[in-house]
Amino acid sequence: MESKLKKLVEFKELSNLYIDLSEDILKNLIFDLSIKDKQNQLLFINCIENSISSLADHIHTSFSNQIESINHLNFKYKWVELSKLETIKNVIQKELDNDGMIEMIEDSKKRILSINNNNLISSNKENDLKKFSLILNKYKTFNELLRKILEEC
């Protein structure tokens, strides 16, 4: 006897829930380099990644007949696959570029996980409230633009 998992939350709702969580976490970040704050920074990034991944899954449902399954991919490569769709290619490609939102997320995560070496002279800028707010704002703009495009299609 096979049992099927019941879908409790739609991808779109899940994406919104993760954004709400990331907004709450951002309010409590203080960027003091403490372990607790670094964990909260990672939690913020993780929520953004999960939201982006859920949004990709939501969009994939609209184009499932034009593109293969993306369920096995991480958040970035889901968007790489979705960028092959002519309808939304330009919007997605902008965020995959070096100065795009997805690169900013990956860079921020690397900075959180990197071990500081005081013997090296480097110009690496630490994560800060401005950068995390920018990531969140870019994502919200990206999200709204994609939803408007999908509504028009």
Residue ranges and their predicted role:
Residues 1-39:
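Charged alpha-helical initiation segments
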Residues 1-8, 58, 87-98:
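Short charge-dense sequence patches
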Residues 67, 73-153:
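Acidic, Ser/Thr/Gly/Pro-rich intrinsically disordered interaction regions
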Residues 31-34, 58-75:
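Short acidic alpha-helical/loop segments enriched in Asp/Glu that coordinate divalent cations
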Residues 14, 43, 131-134:
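Alpha-helical initiation/capping and key positions within long helical/coiled-coil segments
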